[in-house]
């Protein structure tokens, strides 16, 4: 290449760089405008929320002294206020917000809000794939530990994988909640409890008590992974159909339990879920019995018994509540 050609090419590169600088300058300006607009929206939403709260208090004061026609109007306005809160929730999903305590402890004060619907859905889809792949890996790990490798080291690797899996799920779910996912209640707390349980299992030293409970725990892990795989497979298909019909949010997630939207074609999962819940109770009873054994010296036995009992109560009562609510609604629909 001649020097003249090099100079010509360098001139073109210089022009490209100047254009790039101009484009980046415009980008920074737009970014500042976006930040200002985000702050304005957040401020307006908070102001409107306060006004609605004050208005609702005044509205309930009028309700006590109003006649029948006025009460109907008050109820109508009250229903609109509830819908407005759902609208605020959707708006705030696209605005930066302060992280909760857990995300602050893990990530610090980092903005985790994804600005586009496409980015939110992609992150949610990646979360679902992560759950599926790790469920399969945990299933294979539990089968290997139960039937092939009877070593404490391999058990520790399996338990460490469980701790890492549930820790990662809690972080990802917290990010999804910050971005507008409506997963809440016990199905969020459930993973924190499972993280704690897996951590205690990891610290349980090898001994007579551990060996007595080992096979029962691994068999439970195999069953639980199989049920979770079934849930993912059928729930993801059901959610896809409901989203296509506009009946579910695009950030709704598959869960390890049973929710009201699953009545359409997923009731066959209920026997498996209840069996798994009662297996958790059986684990708790077994561990309570072991904790009273003369040879039991480990604190992990009693703590694990309490944790399995907590998981049983949370899972069983939450599932039972969903089933009971559905039956009550069906009764009201009947003439």
Swiss-Prot record:
Coiled-coil segments on the chain, per record: 1-40
Membrane topology term: Multi-pass membrane protein
Keyword tRNA-binding: no
UniProt-annotated location(s): Nucleus inner membrane
A GO CC term attached to the entry: nuclear inner membrane
Segments crossing the lipid bilayer: 100-122, 130-150, 157-177, 193-213, 268-288, 300-320
GO biological process assignments: fat cell differentiation
Superkingdom of origin organism: Eukaryota
Keywords: Coiled coil, Membrane, Nucleus, Transmembrane, Transmembrane helix
Main location: nucleus
UniProt function note: Necessary for efficient adipogenesis. Does not show ion channel activity.
Family indicated by similarity: Belongs to the TMEM120 family.
Protein name, as recorded: Transmembrane protein 120B-A
Organism (species): Xenopus laevis
Gene it is expressed from: tmem120b-a
């Amino acid at each position: 290449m001649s020097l003249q050609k090099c100079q010509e090419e360098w001139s073109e590169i210089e022009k490209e760089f100047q254009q790039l600088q101009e484009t980046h300058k415009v980008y920074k300006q737009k970014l500042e405008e976006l930040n200002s607009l985000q702050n304005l929206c957040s401020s307006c939403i908070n102001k409107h929320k306060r006004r609605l709260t004050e208005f609702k208090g005044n509205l309930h004061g009028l309700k006590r002294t109003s006649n029948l026609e006025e009460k109907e109007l008050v109820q109508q306005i009250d229903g609109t206020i509830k819908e407005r809160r759902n609208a605020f929730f959707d708006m705030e999903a696209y605005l930066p917000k302060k992280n909760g305590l857990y995300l602050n402890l893990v990530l610090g004060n980092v903005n985790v809000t994804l600005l586009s619907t496409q980015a939110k859905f992609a992150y949610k889809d990646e979360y679902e794939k992560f759950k599926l792949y790790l469920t399969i890996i945990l299933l294979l790990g539990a089968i290997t530990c139960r039937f092939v490798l009877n070593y404490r080291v391999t058990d520790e690797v399996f338990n460490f994988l469980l701790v890492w899996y549930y820790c990662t799920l809690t972080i990802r779910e917290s990010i999804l909640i910050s971005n507008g996912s409506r997963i809440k209640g016990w199905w969020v707390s459930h993973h924190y409890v499972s993280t704690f349980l897996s951590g205690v299992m990891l610290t349980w030293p090898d001994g007579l008590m551990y060996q007595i409970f080992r096979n029962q725990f691994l068999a439970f892990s195999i069953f639980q992974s199989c049920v979770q795989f079934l849930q993912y497979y059928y729930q993801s298909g059901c959610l896809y159909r409901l989203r296509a019909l506009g009946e579910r949010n695009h950030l709704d997630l598959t869960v390890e339990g049973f929710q009201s939207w699953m009545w359409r074609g997923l009731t066959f999962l209920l026997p498996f879920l209840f069996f798994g819940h009662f297996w958790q109770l059986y684990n708790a009873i077994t561990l309570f019995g072991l904790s009273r054994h003369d040879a039991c010296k480990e604190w992990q036995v009693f703590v694990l018994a309490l944790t399995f009992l907590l998981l049983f109560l949370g899972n069983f009562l939450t599932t039972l509540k969903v089933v009971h609510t559905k039956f009550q609604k069906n009764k009201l629909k009947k003439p």
